[in-house]
């Protein structure tokens, strides 16, 4: 069930009861799946220095970021996506490590025009592989992302060569789509970046698929 209250911020959602139960049921299945492939969970900050995304995010994301000064007049933002933060962590802690596999389930924020499947406050489930040990990692991640999405729906198509809208990607990426969602059919996107590769699933959109 979804509630609406007076003066609720546009593009946010209040969920209750069966809806919340179903979300956690799917989430727990997704976590069990990726951990069977050697991924470990990571939790990330929701508030970041906005400069993290200036060079890494594409123009569309930059225009949608929630940016504001903190009490010391430093520009910070609500996280618009998670991969850029994982990249920074990798550069600080995992440079000399062998392959590292992480998963995350994080709330993100973008100032978009709200509609079905597109919210200003939304959840992403993602997987990142740092220092991949095989040239076949992209194919493996596509298979894993498909397996995750098929926990909810079999109505999945894959585009194996997509130009992604984030500045840190170094090659063609991939997308998974659910046609029944219409204009908001993309439910997963991923690709390679410096020293890593990963994908993120729009969890709220995936929940709309049947």
Question: Residue ranges of each PLM-predicted region?
Answer:
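TRNA-recognition modules of translation machinery and tRNA-sensing kinases, especially anticodon-binding
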Residues: 1-210
């Amino acid at each position: 069930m979804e509630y609406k209250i007076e003066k609720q911020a546009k593009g946010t959602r209040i969920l209750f009861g069966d809806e919340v139960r179903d979300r956690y049921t799917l989430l727990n299945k997704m976590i069990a799946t990726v951990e069977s492939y050697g991924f470990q969970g990571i939790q990330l900050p929701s508030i970041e220095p906005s400069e993290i995304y200036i060079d890494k995010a594409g123009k569309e994301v930059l225009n949608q970021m929630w940016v504001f000064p903190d009490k010391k007049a430093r520009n910070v933002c609500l996280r618009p996506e998670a991969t850029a933060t994982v990249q920074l962590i990798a550069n600080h802690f995992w440079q000399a490590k062998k392959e590292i596999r992480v998963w995350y389930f994080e709330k993100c924020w973008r100032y978009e025009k709200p509609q079905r499947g597109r919210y200003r406050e939304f959840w992403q489930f993602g997987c990142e592989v740092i220092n991949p040990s095989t040239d076949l990692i992209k194919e493996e991640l596509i298979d894993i992302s498909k397996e995750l999405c098929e926990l909810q729906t079999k109505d999945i198509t894959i585009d194996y060569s997509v130009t992604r809208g984030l500045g840190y990607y170094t090659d063609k990426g991939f997308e998974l789509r659910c046609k029944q969602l219409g204009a908001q059919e993309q439910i997963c996107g991923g690709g390679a970046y410096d020293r890593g590769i990963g994908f993120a699933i729009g969890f709220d959109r995936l929940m709309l698929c049947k």
